[in-house]
Amino acid sequence: MNYDLIIIGAGPAGYVAAEYAGKHKLKTLVVEKEYFGGVCLNVGCIPTKTLLKRAKIVDYLRHAQDYGISINGQVALNWNQLLEQKGKVVSKLVGGVKAIIASAKAETVMGEAKVLDPNTVEVAGKTYTTKSIVVATGSRPRYLTLPGFAEARQNGFVIDSTQALSLEGVPRKLVVVGGGVIGIEFAFLYASLGSEVTILQGVDRILEIFDTEVSDLVAKLLQTKNVKIITNAQVTRANNNEVFYSQNGQEGSVVGDRILVSIGRIPNTECLDGLNLQRDERNRIVLNQDLQTSIPNIYIVGDANAQLMLAHFAYQQGRYAVNHILNKKQVKPAQKLTCPSCIYTNPEVASVGYTEMELKKQGIPYVKTNLVLAHCGKAIADNETNGFVKMMFDPQTGKILGCCIIAATASDMIAELALAMGAGLTVFDIANSISPHPTINEMIADVCKKALFDHFK
């Protein structure tokens, strides 16, 4: 059967592409091998945030006395009920994704796709022809290939982020290999739920892609939960539930009921292996600025192109690819610099634009201003004063170069700054805006007002 568009993958990039294609009357086929909604909805963003919210409530209950509330009796955790709630949330949202695809009048087929040529896709022995192909196949966890890890994984001791969402119970001891975003979120989750957590990080600090103030504060917050962080730890091997590492020439080891390996993700592009696509020196498929491969009617979007593995970045890329197929200019390409990133710890971390570290490395002139949450009335009222808002500006124009926020509502606050950066707004624009009071959000305008006095007199 002939289609205008075949979309391989029904995750964030894929289903949004299908929705946009449907609005423009393209005859569309969506191929999905496992999860409608992709990793994000089924075994990523949504289920982790569901569990992290419950973990945050546990934190509040354990510290109820700090809020003048006495609880008689023990705070008990019902893990099975938490998993059941997680499943209901996922099921509801998967239904929503299926409804979006159906309302776009896109056809669907289940199975693993293989692109045979620029216009033909094979699924479960059947072939489908199309004018354009959008590959939105997502990514998968990267595994350690060091000695003993394959056996430990086979024996159920070594797990990935997908398995960490459906354990039979809260592990008494959890080892997290990798101190990036995913590893840190799981460390917060399980430490709040009662696990004894140890993080093995290969470099000198956790969250190394963020500025040092972020790493330092998050490390302190983890330590209040009795999380042990071992930095400069080069993992060497595993023996079932024991991980061995080298640190400053000395060998050490740590034992856990489960060992969560969180060292990044690999794009799923095997469906394109039969094509002679242009690749770079690292064997990655080369794309142009419009997300086209060297075969122009084949696009790769979302995690599958590994440009920025975030669902909201994938949404925009999915829309943009279809927009480009239609030869329209309604959708702007996704820009890394104005795409916010968040860590759903307690408090949350969010950033957009350059980090101060990147500005220094690239020699970009900047001025910075920051305020701690201890100056914010709402934060004091909420008894949540751990955190800060830091912003960097162009010293000549006042344009926003970057921002980092640690606050209970950081993931909601950062959207304002992503919009401001994308629109080219300046420190003057935000300083002259009126924020509701009392809110944590007014810290953004307060930082800009302080910056005017500090740097733009």
Curated annotation (Swiss-Prot):
Protein name, entry field: Dihydrolipoyl dehydrogenase
Classification via Pfam families: Pyr_redox_2 (PF07992), Pyr_redox_dim (PF02852)
Main location: cytoplasm
Classification via PANTHER family: DIHYDROLIPOYL DEHYDROGENASE, DISULFIDE OXIDOREDUCTASE
Disulfide pattern: C40-C45
Protein encoded by which gene: pdhD
Keywords from the UniProt entry: Cytoplasm, Disulfide bond, FAD, Flavoprotein, NAD, Oxidoreductase, Redox-active center
Subunit structure: Homodimer.
GO cellular component: cytosol; membrane
Catalytic residues, chain numbering: H437
Additional information: The active site is a redox-active disulfide bond.
